[in-house]
From Swiss-Prot:
Basic and acidic residues bias spans: 1-11
Gene: ATG32
UniProt-recorded name of the protein: Autophagy-related protein 32
Highest rank taxon of the organism: Eukaryota
Post-translational modification: Phosphorylation of Ser-114 and Ser-119 are critically important for mitophagy and for the ATG11-ATG32 interaction. Phosphorylation depends on both HOG1 and PBS2.
Length: 529
């Protein structure tokens, strides 16, 4: 390979002295012998390096090392077109300017990205927590195109289209071998693949990734009847839902939430287990069949108690159109709020902090203003309660005292009118309950009453007074007193209500009351007032 490179260099320096057919024959023989081994991703890039070294500039040691390590492709037409395109880039210092800056460590450790490398990075981002994904989105919005230092030799891949100059003669294409070379030069442009390391400061290609798109509110529908449910969703809400394109659980983190539709509880449990394993804490909306709401809630309690899943909306029955409409409206509102939150995150961190602080301050001020009138009203309410409580207690006490006085008055008046009209000495209430039955339960008291009074009310035997506490005497007398008191109260109230203006006259005219008891009536009136 070194000999071949030196031969080509000699031909480029003394092209006029050598015959034109010699260069083409040597290159064809080398390329045809190695066509089976030179098919690879590095062939176009190595051919570019070789052709850049043939433009009259001094070849770099890096280009010599790369040429000696890997063979050059044998397709002359493509090589010529690529050489022309890269010669057009040379005035802009995009091709050869960064080659001397590279060191040997970068060339040995540098690699070209393939589709497998990008897919691995995408999987790592998809399986990362939500906070990491948000940080990646923020970094992409800030315009940071520098790869992290943990991967200093990652390369960026970009397909670009460059215009080709007119037909020129170069040290490598002095004489056309076939008619295909003319067709290659007649093309206006050619598509090439350029790979650069992240360590270069010029012409850095951006890396495109699906994970750096703005997050969208999307719900994944899982279940055997998911397609039929998706068709039944109104068109205005279908944009919020999506059916799984691939039966891959690793795509769960891409969605905002997951809707599970099931017909049996076994299917629900299996879907929940998959979600717990792969969804990374995405909220869930269960949609069950009629009559399964209680069982579904019992199953969800165990998952919620262990903090395995989160509910975005309570369980909904498929046939309940009203609950489904509420769910759709709620999800639409959440999608609008989610979009507003994402737009707010696009602003600078300082602006967000100031807004949040000002918002908190305003909210605290509003809360303090709301609390201040409440604090002023609280003692007033306490005073009102205090006043009303004393008022009610006073009224209740006066009513109770007056009622008690009335009862005692009527009781004493009724009993005295029955028993003490003929007595010169008024006995007490206890004396009225005494009976003269000769029984064993007796209490001996000295006799002090006159014989006239003993003939009418009390009987004495041998200087002793016998008191009987049997039921036939004490209970019956108490019942008669209560009965008479109730009757007198009824008559008194009826007369008072019927003739309020002649209240005192009716009391004086009644046969049961005497004129001498007017002092008691006046005392009762003062108490009632």
């Amino acid at each position: 390979m070194v000999l071949e490179y030196q031969q080509r260099e000699g031909k480029g320096s003394s092209s006029k002295s050598m015959p034109p057919d010699s260069s083409s024959t040597t290159i064809h023989t080398c390329s045809e012998a190695q066509t089976g081994e030179d098919k690879g991703l590095l062939d176009p890039h190595l051919s570019v390096l070789e052709l850049l070294s043939k433009t009259g500039h001094s070849p770099s040691p890096m280009g010599q090392n790369l040429v000696t390590s890997i063979d050059i492709s044998g397709n002359h037409n493509v090589n010529d077109s690529i050489s022309g395109s890269w010669q057009a880039i040379q005035p802009l210092d995009l091709g050869a300017s960064f080659i001397p800056e590279r060191c040997s460590s970068q060339t040995t450790n540098g690699s070209i990205l393939s589709s497998s490398d990008t897919s691995e990075e995408e999987q790592e981002l998809l399986q990362a927590p939500a906070a990491d994904i948000i940080n990646i989105i923020k970094q992409g919005q800030e315009g940071a195109n520098v790869v992290s230092p943990s991967h200093p030799f990652k390369q960026l891949q970009k397909i670009i289209s460059l215009p080709l100059p007119g037909k020129e003669k170069t040290p490598f294409n002095e004489q056309d071998d076939d008619g295909d070379e003319d067709e290659a030069f007649e093309e206006d442009s050619v598509t090439i693949t350029k790979s650069l390391t992240s360590s270069t400061n010029s012409f850095v290609m951006p890396k495109l990734s699906l994970t750096q798109k703005n997050p969208v509110f999307r719900l994944l529908i899982l279940g055997r009847t998911g397609s039929s449910f998706y068709q039944s969703i109104p068109k205005e809400y279908q944009s919020l839902f999506e059916l799984p394109k691939y039966h891959d659980s690793a795509t769960f983190p891409q969605y905002t939430g997951i809707v599970i539709i099931f017909q049996e509880l076994r299917e629900m449990v299996s879907l929940l287990n998959r979600i717990v394993q792969y969804s990374q804490g995405k909220p869930v909306i269960p949609i069950c069949q009629p009559g399964q709401v209680i069982q579904v809630k019992n199953v969800l309690k165990s998952f919620l108690r262990n903090k395995l899943v989160k509910l975005l909306f309570p369980p909904v029955v498929v046939t309940n159109k009203r609950d489904l409409k509420k769910m759709f409206q709620r999800l639409q509102d959440l999608s609008l709020e989610y979009g507003e939150d994402v737009n707010e995150e696009d602003n600078d961190d300082e602006a967000i902090h100031t807004k949040s602080r000002s918002y908190c301050r305003n909210k605290k001020a509003e809360n303090s203003k709301k609390k201040s009138p409440k604090s002023n009203k609280k003692p007033k309410r306490k005073k009102q309660k205090f006043f009303t409580s004393w008022f009610t207690w006073g009224i209740s006490i006066t009513i109770g005292i007056s009622f008690g006085c009335c009862v005692t008055y009527f009781v004493t008046a009724a009993y005295e009118h029955q028993t003490v009209k003929s007595l010169s000495l008024r006995p007490s209430i206890l004396a009225s309950l005494l009976s003269l039955d000769s029984s064993s339960d007796t209490i001996n008291t000295p006799a002090t009453a006159s014989p006239s009074s003993t003939e009418q009310f009390l009987w004495f035997d041998k200087g002793t007074l016998q008191i009987n506490f049997h039921s036939d005497g004490f209970i019956m007398k108490s019942l008669t007193i209560i009965k008479e008191t109730w009757g007198k109260m009824n008559t008194f109230v009826l007369h008072a209500l019927s003739k309020p203006l002649k209240f005192l006259e009716n009391l004086n005219k009644s046969s049961e009351f005497s004129i001498d008891e007017s002092n008691r009536i006046l005392a009762l009136g003062y108490i009632l007032l």
